[in-house]
Amino acid sequence: MPVFTKEALERLPIQLGNFFKKFPPENPNAWTTNPNRQNPFLATRNPQNGLVINPYYSNRRQAEIYKEARLQNLDNLLPQQMSWQKDSTRHILKGLLNPKGKISERKRDEILENRRLKLSESLKKTSKFKNERQKASKIAKPSPF
């Protein structure tokens, strides 16, 4: 049973009226992905061959229809909009979570660790060399007394 009469459809803006002529509203829960009642804002799958069918309306046209429907207080009769799902299930981008950075920034920790290891190693070698040098000088020179 249609919700709108012809007079009511004629009073709506052209784009919104055309939408309700093509896809007459029943109730908000009536929009599904079944072939007999497809949501014109969402992509669906053909049950016979499994191919994806693009949405009937683009995101821009969806936004225009929703704006007009909100102005007329009819947005509850429209099917679920594609952009609503995008925001709620959006994944965090890898680049924002772990930014790539420059090579010097990415390898900074590794470079500092290598530098610290080399410095501690060189200090050990230096102290070892000094100790050997002192022992050698004590052995080589007899005490004058």
Curated annotation (Swiss-Prot):
Component of the mitochondrial large ribosomal subunit (mt-LSU). Mature yeast 74S mitochondrial ribosomes consist of a small (37S) and a large (54S) subunit. The 37S small subunit contains a 15S ribosomal RNA (15S mt-rRNA) and at least 32 different proteins. The 54S large subunit contains a 21S rRNA (21S mt-rRNA) and at least 45 different proteins. GO terms for molecular function: structural constituent of ribosome. This is Large ribosomal subunit protein mL59. Keywords: Mitochondrion, Ribonucleoprotein, Ribosomal protein. One of its GO terms (biological process) is mitochondrial translation. Belongs to the mitochondrion-specific ribosomal protein mL59 family. InterPro entries: Ribosomal_mL59 (IPR037507), Ribosomal_mL59_dom (IPR040922). It comes from Schizosaccharomyces pombe (strain 972 / ATCC 24843) (Fission yeast). GO terms for cellular component: mitochondrial large ribosomal subunit; mitochondrion. Component of the mitochondrial ribosome (mitoribosome), a dedicated translation machinery responsible for the synthesis of mitochondrial genome-encoded proteins, including at least some of the essential transmembrane subunits of the mitochondrial respiratory chain. The mitoribosomes are attached to the mitochondrial inner membrane and translation products are cotranslationally integrated into the membrane.
